[in-house]
């Protein structure tokens, strides 16, 4: 064999080995598919997880429980971890959508607060199907200066009257009003405000006074959306919104960082409000369950979840993480409500299919104003 032939053969073998190695590495690349809410994780969480484990994360986002539920009910989502709210997880687990959580694969499960687990168990019995991620209250976000200008210094900013009393909302219309596009939560808030059971199983409660009030308010509501209000509050494009605690506090922080003179505040109304947890769960048809458990155990580390809470302004269920929270988060009553406020919070039970259909039809009428 000539020197040239040897050189050619060596090059051919080297190239083939490199191709095989590259193919092997590609085959060994582990992947995890996550479907989470928008604006709901720290900027470095996923990159740090990949750096530590070598697992590539494909991360998609949604902004309503209804969107997530539609995908889950259709089946074959392709996701290994999803994040329903606890009241939706209850219904979905009854439908056989999730795998039970194998706690033996989660050494860091011990970090969870027993009191928080007890709260979650109202929807996820025996804490069987979900891992609590962040605690959410549904309250009111408002532009301090614009609301004061519209309603005066005695504006009822600590009450549902601010946004559910038609004469107040009419005065706020010009500076912009938004509601969550979350029918079950809005109806629960309105029913509670009207002195009715927020978990009512009577269809007339949804088609009667609650619906009448929402239709009366409708002309003053600019839009229904479950994420747009964050930036709109921060930019001063709207002045009041029914929204989620951490989202509104993120808006306040964005305005502060932008130094745009917009002062946003969050209130849990004195009459009481809904509280629940968003939960990580593993769909029954998940293909990468080992990777899912690695990610869940990673999230249960105090340093990891504290970093997330410090960025998204939501309370977590990890007792060991509390000392690592920033004072801005830990001492904020809108994030970690004091005992007297917690006493007035209520959870939401799973809606029956019949009530769910009534709510969907009624909500469509409200959104269209008909």
PLM features: residue spans?
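Conserved C-terminal helix/tail region of periplasmic/extracytoplasmic solute-binding proteins
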Residues: 231, 339-370
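Periplasmic-binding protein-like
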Residues: 207-216, 222, 260-281
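N-terminal signal peptide c-region/cleavage motif recognized by signal peptidases
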Residues: 21-22
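Mature extracytoplasmic/periplasmic domains
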Residues: 278, 283-344
């Amino acid at each position: 064999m000539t020197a040239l032939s040897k050189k050619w053969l060596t090059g051919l073998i080297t190239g083939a080995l490199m191709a095989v190695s590259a193919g092997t590495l590609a085959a060994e690349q582990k992947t995890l598919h996550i479907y989470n809410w928008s604006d709901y994780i720290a900027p470095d969480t996923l990159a740090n997880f990949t750096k530590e484990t070598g697992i590539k994360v494909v991360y998609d986002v949604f902004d309503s429980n209804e969107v997530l539920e539609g995908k889950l009910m259709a089946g074959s989502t392709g996701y290994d971890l999803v994040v329903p709210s606890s009241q939706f997880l209850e219904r979905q687990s009854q439908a056989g959508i999730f795998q039970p959580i194998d706690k033996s694969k989660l050494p860091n499960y011990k970090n969870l607060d027993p009191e928080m687990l007890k709260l979650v168990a109202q929807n996820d019995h025996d804490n069987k199907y979900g891992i609590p991620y962040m605690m959410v209250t549904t309250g009111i976000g408002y532009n301090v200066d614009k609301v004061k200008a519209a309603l005066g210094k005695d504006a009822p900013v600590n009450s549902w009257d601010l946004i559910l009393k038609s004469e107040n909302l009419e005065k706020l219309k010009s500076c912009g009003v938004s509601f969550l596009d979350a029918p079950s939560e809005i109806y629960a808030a309105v029913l509670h405000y009207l002195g009715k059971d927020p978990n009512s199983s009577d269809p007339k409660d949804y088609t009667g006074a609650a619906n009448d009030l929402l239709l009366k308010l409708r002309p003053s509501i600019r839009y229904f959306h479950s994420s747009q209000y964050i930036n709109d509050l921060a930019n001063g494009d709207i002045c009041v919104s029914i929204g989620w605690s951490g989202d509104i506090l993120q808006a306040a922080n964005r305005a502060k960082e932008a130094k745009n003179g917009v002062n946003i505040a969050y209130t849990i109304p004195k009459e009481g409000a809904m509280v629940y947890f968003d939960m990580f769960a593993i769909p029954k048809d998940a293909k990468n369950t080992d990777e899912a458990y690695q990610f869940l155990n990673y999230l249960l580390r105090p340093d990891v979840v504290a970093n997330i809470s410090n960025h998204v302004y939501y309370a977590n269920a990890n007792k060991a993480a509390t000392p690592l929270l920033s004072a801005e988060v830990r001492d904020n009553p809108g994030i970690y409500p004091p005992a007297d406020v917690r006493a007035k919070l209520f959870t939401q039970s799973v809606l029956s299919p019949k009530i769910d259909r009534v709510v969907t039809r009624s909500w469509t009428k409200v959104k269209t104003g008909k």
